[in-house]
Amino acid sequence: MKKTFVSAAQLEQIAAQYPTPFHIYDEQGIRENARRLNAAFSWNPRFREYFAVKATPTPAIMKVLQEEGCGCDCSSLTELMMAERIGCVGEHIVFSSNETPAEDYRLAAKLGAVINLDDLTHVDFLERAIGYIPKKIGCRFNPGGTFSLGETREGFQVMDNPGDAKYGMTRAQIAEAFRLLKAKGAEEFGIHAFLASNTLSNEYYPALARMLFRLAAELQQETGCHITFIDLSGGVGIPYRPDEPANDIAVIGEGVRRAYEEILVPAGMGDVALYTELGRFMLAPYGHLVTRAIHAKHIYKEYIGTDACACDLMRPAMYGSYHHITVMGKEDAPCDHKYDIVGGLCENNDKFAVDRMLPGIDIGDLLVIHDAGAHGLAMGYNYNGKLRCAEVLLQPDGSTRLIRRAETPEDYFATMVWDD
C-alpha cells in the first residue's frame, strides 16, 4: 500500500491555506533520494545528475536539487532561462534537445552549457547559429531496432523501439559527426542515449551503459576523438502501482560500475565522467496532486467528481497511466466501493481512475493522487479555459511555502488581443 508523506490532519490544515487542487512536494524526500543517487555513483569522481527540468520546471524544486549537487538538463529556451535564473550555468547545464531553433543554441552557448547534438546536420546548423563549435560537445546515439530486457512492464511503451524514434544519430552518422566536430575545433566529446522510459528493472542502466561504453571505446579508436563523458540520460522508472517492485539505485550504480571496469578501464578510458538526466525518478514519488471530492454521480457507473482535472495531471487521460489514489482519513477503511474518479473537462477521458476499488467517498473528502511529482503540472494546459493550480513545498520542518501560485483569469486572458 502506498503511503502519503502528509497525514490527513496535516493536509486539511494545508488545504485550508491553499485551496484545492494543488500539487505538493516533499522536500526531505527529494533531498534523500538525490543523496542516494549520488552515493550510488560516487565511485565515478565526476558523476553528475542533470535534473530533467521538463519533468518539473519549478525554480524552487530545481534549487533544492541544485543544493544537492545536481545540474539542469534543459531542452528549450525557457528551461535554459530558468536554469540561469537560479544560478545554474556553465557545465552545470546539459542542453539536450531536438529540432532545435537557432535562438536556443545561442543561449545554450552563451551560458556555457554542454550541448548534445541530436542530428548530423546540426553540426553545421550550430556553427552557423553561434559562429563556432564548442570545445566540449556531445552527440545523441540511436542504435535502431528494438531495445528490450525481455520484460513487459508498464512504462516501456514510450520508447522501447529506437528504430521508430525521431531522436539521435545512427552509428555511421555519429562517427562522421565526431570527425567533423574535431575538424572544426572540438576537443572533448560525449555520447548520449535514451532508449526506454520508466523502466522497472535494475538492469536497464547497466545494459545501456555496456552499449555506450563499447561504442565510446570504438569511436575513440576510430576517430581519435577524446571522449570525456557518457550521458545515460533518463529512463529509470518508479513503481506507480503498489504491487510493483521499486528500482534499487545502489544496485543500478554497481551494475554500471562493473560495466565501466570491464569495458572502459581496459580501453584506457578510466577517466570518463558519467552523467544522468533523471526526472521521474528524482521527483515523481515526492509529489502529490491534492483534490477534493465535489460531486457524486450515480448512473450506469458510480462517479466521483473532483475539483482537479486532466489539466492538472494528464498522464491518466493521455496514456491510460495508473496513479494510486488515497482517500485521506480513510487509509485503513476497506476498499469496497468501485468508482471512476473524474474531472470536469468536456472530454470523456478526463478520468484519474476507472473502476477503482476505494473506500466509500463522501463529498468534501480530500483525495491524494500519488506519484504526480514529475510530468504533472509540467504537462498542464488550459483546455476548457481551466486554470493551472498552485504548487506547495512541504519543508523538512513540517512548514509549507507556496512555490507557484494558481493561475488567475487575468493570466489566461493576458495574451489575448481584444477588438474593443
Language-model features: where?
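A charged N-terminal "starter" segment
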Residues: 1-136, 181-187, 221, 226, ...
